[in-house]
Amino acid sequence: MSAPHIVVVGGGLAGLAAALECADAGARVSLFEARPRLGGATWSTSHRGLEVDNGQHVFLRCCDAYLGLLDRLGVHDRVTLQDRLAVPVASPGRPLAWIRRGALPAPAHLARSLLGFHPLPFAARVRAALSARRIATLDPDDPALDRVSLGDWLQLRGESDAAIDGLWDLLVRATLNQPAREASLALAVKVLRTGFLDRADAADVGWSRVPLSRLHAEPAEAALRRAGAALHLRASVDALECRAGQSPLLRIRGAALEPDAVILACDHESAARLLPGSAGVDTVALRALGRSPIVNLHVVLDRRVLELPFVAGFGTPLQWMFDRTQASGVERGQVLAISLSGADAWLGRSNAELRDVFLPALAALLPAAREARVLDFFTTREPAATFRQAPGTRALRPPSRTSAPGLFLAGAWTATGWPATMEGAVRSGRAAAEAALADLRVSRAREAA
């Protein structure tokens, strides 16, 4: 009996994880990606001799599936993962504050950092520590938590505006791509419990030391080709048909393709366009997931102004800033990447407008930047970086299985229980692959019997 043929539509992290899982299980895999590259929302480009990422991506030690993908690709040596959580927080005119992992067991390991977080008054720090203790008891799978925002919940507990917009935003905005006031409490609890509170080492921060294309797309392409997968770039799927009692039919460049299974691993808006009603997926709900942007600012300076790998901001429009000098291939000076999540306010601003806001903010935050000469300043924008992780989205996210035989969904927008992160994307791809392989094994066993 020949190996089953599985088609994966989409070459982002979800699609790559699904394709590798299927190929490793012995399936014949074909991957179709509309763009000329793999990697999805994690990609690199050249700009005036610099190699830069579209945006800064980090992961945490708790991201088991993502770390497993790095191991499968053989690129674990291309990332840095902290031995112990240590996040420097800069605010104008103040010394650095630190969020560090202490020696106490979880969740008390962060108590000293929260109580010593000097950008907030002491009373606000105590309230934040008490809120963290309460969050550690909440169930992220409780549907009631998805009906309220983290900000509203914190306000009901007496948290100040400074604490909500400063400390709590710092902890969840980069992960949920939403400010704390607009983020689903359920997803925030997932982030805070899994990432910070349940395990003492869970929040140790990791990042790539190389451009993202060298971390994901290039090694994944090589691994898939070694596994015998067929890769088709610049190949858009024109239509998807679900037929009663049969596997799906794809139409690509006018040709019909009838694999044993299809894993639809594109973004949720593309999935909503492709999915027929017979798939049993609520495409109105998919469209209602919306989109949330990320804007990244790239600043090239004639000297070093940041002597840390990264720093978070408090009381400044700068959210997170990373030293990308080595990864960019620059030998002198410094390249900074400033990541702005939930960036609705910045998405439509021109490069000049962003420069006028963020260069003074950079100088206010890092005194050394006041004397530095700006050699270049440019932006990369992801208008649909993630779905909008607001209250009410839990019910909109579909499972990996559909009601159509042989059709499965993957993507960070599916019902993984995780937010729209690299970890969520990889988990979704693996779940879809496991479901497809399990169904094919059952189907073939029935045929053999």
Locate predicted features.
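Glycine-rich FAD pyrophosphate-binding loop
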Residues: 23-47
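N-terminal Rossmann-like FAD-binding beta1-loop-alpha1 element of flavoenzymes
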Residues: 4-31
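Helical element adjacent to the flavin cofactor pocket in flavoenzyme catalytic cores
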Residues: 190-253, 257-261
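Mid-domain catalytic core of redox enzymes
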Residues: 85, 235-369, 397, 445-449
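FAD-binding beta-loop-beta segment adjacent to the flavin cofactor pocket
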Residues: 187, 326-330, 382-409, 413-416
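A conserved FAD-binding loop/helix module that cradles the flavin
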Residues: 414-436
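Mobile amphipathic helical/loop "lid" adjacent to a hydrophobic cofactor/ligand pocket
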Residues: 52, 66-67, 71-72, 76-190
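Glycine-rich active-site loop/strand segments that organize a redox cofactor
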Residues: 43-61, 133-138
